[in-house]
Amino acid sequence: MTTANERFIPPDFTNHSPLTWYQAAASRPGFIQDASQRKAIECLDKLWTELMMFKRKRNRFLGRSLRSPQLPKGLYFYGGVGRGKSFLMDVFYGCLPYRRKRRVHFHAFMAEIHRRLRELKSEQDPLKSVDAEIARETRVLCFDEFHVSDIADAMILGRLLENLFNEGVVLVATSNYAPAELYPQGQNRSSFLPTIALLEEKLTILNVDSGEDYRLRTLHSADVFYIPADNLKDRKSGSAGMP
């Protein structure tokens, strides 16, 4: 957030963890802190730290008869429209120096999955093959606007995610809905409940609602305007850095 009289200029993501970036941003004119966002940043910073440690331990593990390091638990944060979820994802994704990372809108990702499945339909288990391909391409997968409303997505999502977890992919997702609220009143929803349980088991679930809607604040105040998250960082996948 910034005021009309004080233009907030975000720090560069380079050489920052999410928390140190947030602290640097908070020291600049025009930045308005939010307790709920700060809590989310701390959770993202914890995951960032675990991913960096995992990378170092995995490098030591390769080629040695050591125990494989434990994969960090991913994160699912949800809240209403205007709570700054895209901003939070911008910070995490921008600060993470992994080469094999990807950020994608969830519905675009599912459309891609269905396309890949059609291309591999002659294989015995096309979904497993698709998941293996994704795991080779991506170690940290970030979803914007995770939501399930289509039965075709709902019926394959559980196995899709389970395969990705088994392949060692770490997921981070934003959503307007808690996992238990996904696929509401959908056809055969009872068969989707194990997918909800899987999300709750494999991901840390965090509610970022704070009662502050920055988009509404924009409409109600001439002195304050919202900085679109896209202005902070280009969302292009696969920036240079660690795999």
Region spans (language model):
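N-terminal pre-Walker A segment at the start of P-loop NTPase domains
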Residues: 31-63
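Pre-Walker A (Motif I) flank of P-loop NTPase domains
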Residues: 62-77, 139
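Conserved lysine of the Walker
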Residues: 85
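AAA+/P-loop NTPase substrate/partner-engagement loops
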Residues: 94-125, 129-133
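Conserved nucleotide-sensing/catalytic segment adjacent to the nucleotide-binding pocket
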Residues: 118-165
